[in-house]
Amino acid sequence: DKQALLIDIILFTDLRKSGISDDINDTINYSTVCKEIIMLLQKEFATIECIAETLAQQIKQKFNILRIKIKVRKPKALLKKGAQYAAVEIER
């Protein structure tokens, strides 16, 4: 069964060119990044650790990202235990 996930991603890259030019073509297309994430999440995963690692590797490589920080939260995983969510956070 598919479960809801909350994913926070921070991309670290050189934004000087777009900061100076104010040209959207000189920066990361965040819409394209989101589409890539949605596509990657169509695969079945057993763990949120594997989700985080897969997203980190693929996004970093495809979009020429220097560093990436990803937090994957599973909101309903531990409700019966009184926790808001289970989570994993990685930085690559």
Model-derived regions, located:
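N-terminal, polar/charged subdomain of small-to-medium soluble alpha/beta proteins
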Residues: 1-92
